[in-house]
UniProtKB/Swiss-Prot annotation:
Top-rank EC class of the record's enzyme: transferase
GO terms assigned for molecular function: identical protein binding; N2-acetyl-L-ornithine:2-oxoglutarate 5-aminotransferase activity; pyridoxal phosphate binding
Keywords: Amino-acid biosynthesis, Aminotransferase, Arginine biosynthesis, Mitochondrion, Pyridoxal phosphate, Transferase, Transit peptide
UniProt-annotated location(s): Mitochondrion matrix
HAMAP family per record: ArgD_aminotrans_3
Role: catalyzes the conversion of N-acetylglutamate-gamma-semialdehyde (NAGSA) to N-acetylornithine in arginine biosynthesis.
Protein source organism: Saccharomyces cerevisiae (strain ATCC 204508 / S288c) (Baker's yeast)
Highest taxon in the source lineage: Eukaryota
Recorded family membership: Belongs to the class-III pyridoxal-phosphate-dependent aminotransferase family.
Protein name per Swiss-Prot or TrEMBL: Acetylornithine aminotransferase, mitochondrial
Location of the transit peptide in the chain: 1-13
């Protein structure tokens, strides 16, 4: 239990966590012996209990440039004293600059070659909602029956009703009854001929296809280049809009600015979405479309109150400038090599516990034979924060700026946790 505590930076008093959580809806499961009070790059601090942690979660792939990034804090302070919000009734320079920058940097760094327009919103699920609406609008303009969406098993696209409808895990969907209709789930492991047959047979009913280039919540599964390339060809031939969800795997996380930059240009999506790292913890998201999609949209087709506000855009402009840099991305790949090397060494020591290591860049997963709940708990006791993905995979998504020595220290703690659990 937390003892009553007066923070040095806030007048807020912590009573017991049980008393505190009585005021929050019951939608999260959190450890009751941990309350984060501050952070610094890839470390988090619990000043209530006098503990510190190496953070391999980065707020679930959000704080790509680290906790308490001083430049982000400076930008927020400056912009908050200038203009926070003026609505989407009017242009603001920060929003215009960011939209142009996303399009230009995307093309420069091998992403969507025909990127054209940007819709700014506040969260990943919102960005995916916009993508689904845009794809459906494009389809319905061609044929009123062309409004279905194809998604994939093990996918996760969000928890609002549209994004939830294309999220695979039934535990998220079934409690809420009927969701958005005309959604089909296919298996990415199926042969291309089977996928092609399904899409061709239902081409007059399918408006869009949504896929994560690297499935995150489903277990850190990178989709093969050949599979994504084949899917784009099939969809293009059948006038189906391809959406890539890069909420988690985008913005340098894969070692490239966008995960779809590993693909040939002809396989690039018609729409892709970004959030999480886009604001380094400040809420902002984006839906990026090509001109084919934009041509289907009209004034009033979509909107958002806070999306593209100057405060969020000012931070995002800095984030994009920092990550869209060859030297920065090379450092991500270098850090990935360090982390992968240690993971494979640990796997070699515990082959009966760890089945495989997979992922790209600093989005890696270690799949265990059994659910790694106790390993994660023990790691936390040893000062390391890690999370799961899927049923039995430990996910590693640290800040892209994590120090090399912290990677080593974190992996030492991970190995000790495995040893303690399986000794």
């Amino acid at each position: 239990m937390f003892k009553r505590y007066l923070s040095s930076t806030s007048s807020r008093r912590f009573t017991s966590i049980l008393e505190e959580k009585a005021f929050q809806v019951t939608t999260y499961s959190r450890p009751e012996d941990l309350c984060i009070t501050r952070g610094k790059n890839a470390k988090l601090y619990d000043d209530v209990n006098g503990k510190e942690y190496i953070d391999f979660t980065a707020g679930i792939a959000v704080t790509a440039l680290g906790h308490a990034n001083p430049k982000v804090a400076e930008i927020l302070h400056h912009q908050a004293n200038k203009l926070v919000h003026s609505s989407n009734l009017y242009f603001t320079k920060e929003c215009l600059d960011l939209s142009e920058k996303i399009v230009e940097k995307t093309k420069q760094f091998g992403g969507q070659h025909d990127a054209s327009r940007v819709f700014l919103c506040n969260s990943g699920t919102e960005a995916n909602e916009a993508a689904l609406k845009f794809a459906k609008k494009h389809g319905i303009m061609k044929n009123p029956s062309k409004q279905g969406i194809v998604a994939f098993e093990n996918s996760f696209h969000g928890r609002t009703m549209g994004a939830l409808s294309v999220t695979w895990n039934s535990k998220y969907r079934t409690p809420f009854g009927d969701l958005v209709p005309h959604v089909s789930f296919l298996n990415l492991n199926d042969e291309m001929t089977k996928l092609q047959s399904y899409i061709e047979t239902k081409k007059d009913e399918i408006a869009g296809l949504i896929v994560e280039p690297i499935q995150g919540e489903g277990g850190v599964f990178p989709v093969e280049v050949e599979k994504l390339t084949g899917l784009k060809k099939i969809c293009q031939d059948n006038d189906v809009i391809v959406i890539h969800d890069e909420i988690q795997c985008g913005l340098g996380r894969s070692g490239k600015l966008w995960a779809h930059a590993y693909l040939p240009s002809e396989a690039h999506p018609d729409i892709f979405t970004s959030a999480k790292a886009l604001g380094n913890g400040f809420p902002i998201a984006a839906t990026i479309v090509n001109e084919k999609v934009n041509n289907a949209l009209r004034v009033g087709d979509h909107g958002t109150t806070y999306g593209g506000n100057p405060l969020a855009c000012s931070v995002s402009n800095y984030v994009l400038d920092t990550i869209a840099d060859e030297a920065f991305l090379k450092q991500v790949s270098k850090k990935s090599d360090i982390l992968q090397k240690r993971l494979r060494e640990i796997q070699a020591k515990y082959p009966n516990q760890i089945k495989t290591i997979r992922g790209k860049g600093l989005m890696l997963g270690a799949e265990f034979v059994e659910p790694p709940t106790e390993v994660i708990k023990k790691a936390r006791e040893l000062g390391l924060l890690i999370i799961t993905a899927g049923k039995s995979t430990v996910r590693f998504v640290p800040a892209l700026t994590i120090e090399d020595e912290l990677i080593e220290e974190g992996m030492d703690a991970f190995e000790k946790a495995i040893e303690a659990v399986y000794a």
